[in-house]
């Protein structure tokens, strides 16, 4: 939910920290701050409420320079959005700490520290860490030892970084449940929550695991567990390009990412089409054995990824002919669940760090599930590393808080999963005939066709901007797309929107319909179209204004109070991927008309790494 970055360098580190914070701003943007060790090892701190741009102006005004430093961009969890709660937190003008996560036992730790004479100036759980490190530094031989002792007292999820005026050539970092990686360069060592923040200085990275504590010095890098036993982490070369995280000609990252979807979907499907759905090539070593005799599938996800699994569940049942269920990670982990040794557990997460999903995976494994598969956009993240199999969607970096290309590439991956399960050993007798890879090659073109409707969608969006509420309807495979459309609209335009299966209208939601309630209908030319048309008549008869996304081969025509936009010819089971595009564009352009911050909507962050 927050982003941290910093390191130790032989040159001034302040520009790198500020640029890194800008690249991490999608993780949190309530406030930002940095601390450096100056020329005389003085601990210097600057904090500001608002965006990184405000922090940059304050840093430039003070002329800060230093070769050891830490930075933070915040999404508030403990304490309001005030400068006193912005990181870094300082103890006795000697220790500075930045922190991503939540310390669950901070009330008890705070009471203990207050009894020991420590004074608190913020409402945050992070200040506890700063005082703990200071407390242990009084007897520890160095900052590294003090940090290890301090994190041993913490319960919860965290990625932290610590500097000290008494250890002027050192940064210490620790990870438990939140993403943290190290960067290796000729001129020093660095850390960040996301590899994008390290691209200006290095592509050589190491991913820390839970329980790791690391000491960074200019020429030295040491990783241990909390007890001090040495740990080794493999070095990777990041393939991420700097251009991939730049806006280019686009106004917003969300706009850029919407328009990248034809390529992202094509890249995600490329390996499958080239390998003819070879299980090992597509899903990794052990996939054939893992998929053999699977008798049900459990999907675990949160947010937009959960909506993708609602589609995937239906694909599995239609194509493979076995039961499937889709659960929210934060609900699954706290309820009683009956394990099934032949059940495949599939987790979806764009970042691979979504805490609710990760903990749900842990719960499933604790129950004895060994058949686990992660579908993720970040290869070396926590959820794929904790899974037996992994599939990497090739969406590229997604910076906008509202997910777009990650969603459609997840859908593409789920369709491939259904096809793969249908051809796995022991599956032939139970499979339906509905699934076919034949239309996959045409899918990127259909997505581009949907994008070409953007000028028409802009006209619709102008009508939405003045509305307070909206209703989205769909049936079957397209009800989850209605859910996704409603979520996108409320996320970035702040228009209250709800989604329902169209058949539920008469059971309550129809009471909401009037002339001020726009009703968006996902209306593909499938076997439910006539049923859906009847539901639309119910809305029209009560004065509701209909906005219909139909296929080019459907019979819908525009009339008074009924607006129709035609997508490509019906894409069969792949239709949800195509119909996701216009609801994304509708939300984006409605937000533009309203003047909201599209990439950084209020109260939201991209990577939800706290419970």
UniProtKB/Swiss-Prot annotation:
Residues of the active site: 2, 606
Enzyme class: transferase
Gene Ontology terms, MF aspect: carbohydrate derivative binding; glutamine-fructose-6-phosphate transaminase (isomerizing) activity
Pfam families: GATase_6 (PF13522), SIS (PF01380)
GO biological process: carbohydrate metabolic process; fructose 6-phosphate metabolic process; protein N-linked glycosylation; UDP-N-acetylglucosamine metabolic process
Domain SIS: start-end pairs: 287-427, 460-601
Catalytic activity: D-fructose 6-phosphate + L-glutamine = D-glucosamine 6-phosphate + L-glutamate
Compartmental location: Cytoplasm
Keyword NADP: no
Keyword DNA-binding set for record: no
Record keywords: Aminotransferase, Cytoplasm, Glutamine amidotransferase, Repeat, Transferase
UniProt-listed SUPFAM superfamilies: N-terminal nucleophile aminohydrolases (Ntn hydrolases), SIS domain
Gene Ontology cellular component terms for the protein in this record: cytosol
Main location: cytoplasm
Domain Glutamine amidotransferase type-2 residue range list: 2-219
EC number assigned by the record: 2.6.1.16
Record text on subunit structure and interactions: Homodimer.
Function, in words: Catalyzes the first step in hexosamine metabolism, converting fructose-6P into glucosamine-6P using glutamine as a nitrogen source.
PANTHER family named in the record: GLUCOSAMINE--FRUCTOSE-6-PHOSPHATE AMINOTRANSFERASE, ISOMERIZING, GLUTAMINE--FRUCTOSE-6-PHOSPHATE TRANSAMINASE (ISOMERIZING)
The protein's name in its UniProt record: Glutamine--fructose-6-phosphate aminotransferase [isomerizing]
Biological source species: Acidithiobacillus ferridurans
């Amino acid at each position: 939910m927050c982003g941290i970055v910093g390191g130790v360098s032989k040159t001034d580190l302040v520009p790198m920290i500020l640029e890194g914070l800008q690249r991490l701003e999608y993780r949190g943007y309530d406030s930002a701050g940095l601390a450096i060790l100056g020329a005389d090892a003085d601990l210097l701190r600057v904090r500001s409420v608002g965006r990184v741009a405000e922090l940059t102006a304050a840093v430039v005004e003070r002329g800060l320079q230093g070769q050891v430093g830490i930075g933070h961009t915040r999404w508030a969890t403990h304490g309001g959005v005030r400068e006193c709660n912005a990181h870094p937190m300082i103890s006795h003008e000697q220790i500075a700490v930045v922190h991503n996560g939540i310390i669950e036992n901070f009330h008890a730790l705070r009471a203990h520290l207050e009894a020991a004479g420590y004074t608190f100036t913020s409402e945050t759980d992070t200040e506890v860490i700063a005082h703990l490190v200071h407390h242990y530094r009084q007897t520890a031989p160095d900052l590294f030892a003090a940090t290890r002792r301090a994190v041993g007292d913490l319960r919860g999820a965290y990625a932290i970084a610590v500097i000290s005026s008494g250890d002027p050539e050192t940064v210490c970092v620790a990870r438990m449940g939140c993403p943290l990686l190290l960067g290796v360069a000729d001129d020093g060592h660095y850390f960040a929550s996301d590899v994008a923040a390290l691209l200006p200085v290095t592509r050589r990275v190491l991913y820390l695991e839970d329980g790791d504590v690391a000491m960074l010095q200019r020429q030295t890098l040491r990783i241990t567990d909390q007890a001090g036993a040495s740990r080794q982490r493999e070095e990777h070369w990041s393939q991420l390009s700097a251009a991939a995280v730049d806006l280019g000609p686009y106004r917003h990252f969300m706009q850029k990412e919407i328009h990248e979807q034809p390529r992202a979907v094509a890249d995600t499907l490329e390996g499958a089409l080239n390998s003819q759905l070879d299980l090992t090539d597509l899903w990794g070593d052990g996939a054939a054995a893992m998929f053999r005799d699977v008798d049900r599938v459990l999907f675990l996800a949160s947010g937009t990824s959960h909506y993708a699994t609602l589609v995937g569940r239906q694909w599995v049942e239609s194509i493979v002919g076995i039961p499937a269920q889709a659960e929210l990670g934060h609900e699954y982990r706290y309820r009683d669940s009956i394990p099934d040794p032949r059940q495949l557990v599939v987790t979806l997460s764009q970042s691979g760090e979504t805490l609710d999903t990760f903990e749900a995976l842990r719960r499933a494994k604790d129950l004895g599930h060994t058949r686990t598969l992660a579908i993720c956009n970040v290869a070396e993240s926590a959820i794929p590393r904790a899974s037996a199999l992994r599939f990497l969607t090739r969406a590229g970096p997604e910076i906008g808080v509202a997910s777009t290309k990650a969603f459609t590439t997840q859908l593409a991956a789920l369709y491939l999963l259904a096809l793969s399960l249908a051809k796995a050993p022991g599956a032939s007798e139970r499979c339906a005939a509905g699934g076919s890879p034949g239309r996959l090659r045409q899918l990127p073109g259909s997505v581009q066709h949907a994008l070409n409707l953007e000028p028409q969608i802009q006209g619709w969006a102008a009508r939405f901007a003045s509305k307070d509420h909206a209703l989205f309807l769909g049936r079957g495979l397209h009800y989850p797309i209605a859910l996704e459309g409603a979520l996108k609209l409320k996320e970035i335009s702040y228009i209250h929107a709800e989604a329902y299966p169209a058949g539920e209208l008469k059971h309550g939601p129809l009471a909401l319909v009037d002339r001020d309630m726009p009703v968006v209908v996902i209306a593909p030319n499938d076997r439910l179209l006539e049923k859906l048309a009847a539901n639309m008549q119910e809305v029209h008869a009560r004065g509701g204004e209909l906005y219909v996304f139909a296929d080019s081969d459907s019979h819908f025509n525009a009339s008074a109070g009924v607006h129709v936009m035609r997508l490509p010819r019906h894409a069969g089971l792949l239709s949800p991927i195509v119909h996701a595009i216009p609801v994304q564009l509708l939300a984006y352009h409605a937000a533009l008309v309203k003047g909201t911050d599209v990439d950084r909507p209020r109260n939201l962050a991209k990577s939800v790494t706290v419970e």
